[in-house]
Amino acid sequence: MRPGLQPSLGLTSSSLPDDALEVGRILDAWGVKGWVKILPHSTDPEALFSAKTWYLQTPDVKFRPGFSLFSGTVSLKVDEAKIHSGAVVAKFSGLDDRDAAEALRGARIFLSRSSFPAASADEYYWVDLIGLNVLNREGVALGCVRDLMATGPHSVLCVEYASTQEDGTSATAERMIPFVAAYVDKVDIAGKCITVDWQPDY
């Protein structure tokens, strides 16, 4: 952290909460009054709107080589976060001009899981589904949820599994399972498992 910079920007040296989840990154400054534009990792940015404290870590080098504004983890108080013209934008306490906002470009955003609003019945945050094992009704393991993607009316589970190529070598493959009631029987977050009506050869 460069001397004198942290207080002027409202940055506070911190450490990530034990339940921290990476939810996006700062794309760029937005406007001239210290607002920033956010790239969320999920199509549902509700957690960004409810959390009053965000945690930032240095950008991936490919997004922002030579970043030196801070090192480690810092926290910021959020004055406001909202959607404007289809983009998520936010204003932090202590960041009041475009130069200050541009200085954060590329920073990775983390939130405490405890700050997420409660999901409705039969609704789940993507971050809670990633990493769950997927089994079908017969108990056959179909793989592990690597990611999800939005396809208009519903989400799709990207399930990664081990496979064997024609030459006998091991490889990793992926199957797509629509995350809809017609195929998903049960989601057990505590048990880290999703049961689906799906066959390995689909």
Swiss-Prot record:
Question: What is the annotated localization of this protein?
Answer: Cytoplasm
Molecular function, one GO term: ribosome binding
Give Gene Ontology CC terms: cytoplasm; ribosome
Q: Name one GO biological process term.
A: ribosomal small subunit biogenesis
Whether Chaperone counts among this entry's keywords is yes
Record bears the keyword Hydrolase: no
Alphabetized, the UniProt keywords read: Chaperone, Cytoplasm, Ribosome biogenesis, rRNA processing
**PRC barrel domain location, by residue?**
121-202
A Pfam family that the UniProt record links to this protein: RimM
The record's similarity note reads: Belongs to the RimM family.
Q: Which NCBIfam families match?
A: 16S_RimM
Q: What is known of its domains?
A: The PRC barrel domain binds ribosomal protein uS19.
Q: How does it assemble?
A: Binds ribosomal protein uS19.
* Role summary: An accessory protein needed during the final step in the assembly of 30S ribosomal subunit, possibly for assembly of the head region. Essential for efficient processing of 16S rRNA. May be needed both before and after RbfA during the maturation of 16S rRNA. It has affinity for free ribosomal 30S subunits but not for 70S ribosomes.
What protein name does the entry list?
Ribosome maturation factor RimM
Q: Which organism is it from?
A: Polaromonas naphthalenivorans (strain CJ2)
Identify the taxonomic lineage of the organism of origin. Answer: Bacteria, Pseudomonadati, Pseudomonadota, Betaproteobacteria, Burkholderiales
